Regions:
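Helix N-cap/beta->alpha junction signal
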Residues: 66-67, 207
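Short alpha-helix boundary/capping and kink motifs at helix termini
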Residues: 2-63, 69, 75, 79-80, ...
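Short, charged/polar micro-motifs that form catalytic or ligand-binding hotspots
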Residues: 59-64, 200-204
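Alpha-helix N-cap/helix-start and coil->helix boundary motif
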Residues: 70-71, 211
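Short active-site-adjacent helix-start/loop capping segments
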Residues: 64-66, 74, 92-96
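Solvent-exposed functional surfaces
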Residues: 86-290
Length: 290
């Protein structure tokens, strides 16, 4: 991968990561970007003049596993390099979950017909309150949770990648056309929402993407929808605070300055639970650079 030989290795609990910078042109995103998220991040990054956190990349395939929007914003800012944490994606300790869309509605029946209109072209199924099956479908399959008089889970069992992408984008387009508030939550948070039976909350998500489906994007060039995967690593790196000006320099100069910055910093382990950017992290450790 690339010509950069300078790498800062860290071993956390027998899970090895390598910290370095790589050429942006050598990396492969596996997801599309959300323009709203990118616009907000772009403004903040330009104002600060630095990238806070490195992205995470599979060292075998050069596929970006975490940090698609940071990658996209550095491209927009004409940077040549990006700070990365290299990992071995074959490790069983790296897990893949999915992000789920949480939609706030005054009256879910207003978009119910639109949702069924989208699904009628496919061999969908419906579940009503069969808890164990319900949770399995939320985690594994493409689904929509409708909290109507009789709550319903509409789902498509193991759709192919193209069908999955079409449906996720179609559902998102309904939400955006109605100008409804939407946020992203985890699988565990989604199950808690279903248990609450809040009649003003709709949930939907695509199928859970597998590791081979993530890597295959490099060959197929068809990206998964934005926020499709939620990767969970044993450890993540925070606050490298890399100046953007370094990432625009010629290769040798950029690499040397980047590693000079790392050598001057101290790193410390944050054991879960810990707080980062107003989020309580419970699933992995953090390495904080100061």
């Amino acid at each position: 991968m690339g010509s950069n030989k300078l790498q800062y290795k860290i071993n956390y609990n027998d899970f090895e990561i390598e910290l370095t910078i790589l050429k942006i042109e050598e990396l492969y995103p596996h997801e599309e970007i959300d323009e709203k998220i990118l616009k907000k991040m772009l403004k903040e990054t330009e104002e600060k003049g630095m990238l806070y956190h490195p992205i995470i990349v599979d060292k075998n395939s050069s596929v970006i596993l975490d940090g698609t929007h940071r990658f996209a914003l550095l491209k927009k800012l004409n940077c040549k390099f990006i700070p990365v944490v290299l990992v071995d994606y074959n490790s069983k300790r790296i897990q893949v979950e999915k992000w789920i869309r949480k939609v706030y509605l005054q009256n879910p029946t207003t978009i119910k017909n639109k949702i069924f209109e989208i699904f009628k072209r496919y061999n969908y199924k419906i579940l009503q309150d069969e808890k164990s099956s319900l949770y399995d479908r939320i985690i594994q399959d493409l689904f929509v949770w409708l909290p109507l008089e009789q709550p319903k889970l509409i789902y498509l069992e193991n759709p192919d990648i193209d069908t999955n992408s079409i449906l996720v984008k179609s559902l998102e387009s309904i939400v955006r056309s109605e100008e409804i508030k939407m946020e992203f939550i985890t699988e565990k948070e989604a199950i808690k929402e279903v248990e609450k039976r809040n009649k003003n909350i709709i949930l939907f998500g695509g199928k859970r993407i597998t590791k081979p489906e993530v890597i295959k994007v490099r060959e197929l060039k068809n990206l998964h929808p934005a926020k499709s995967t939620r990767h969970i690593f044993p450890v993540k790196v925070f606050y490298l605070n890399t100046p953007l000006e370094i990432l625009k320099l010629p290769e040798n100069e950029a690499v040397n300055k980047f590693h000079s910055i790392i050598k001057k910093k101290r790193s410390k382990i944050l054991f879960p639970p810990f707080k980062i950017e107003n989020t309580i992290v419970t699933e992995y450790a953090g390495i904080l650079f100061e």
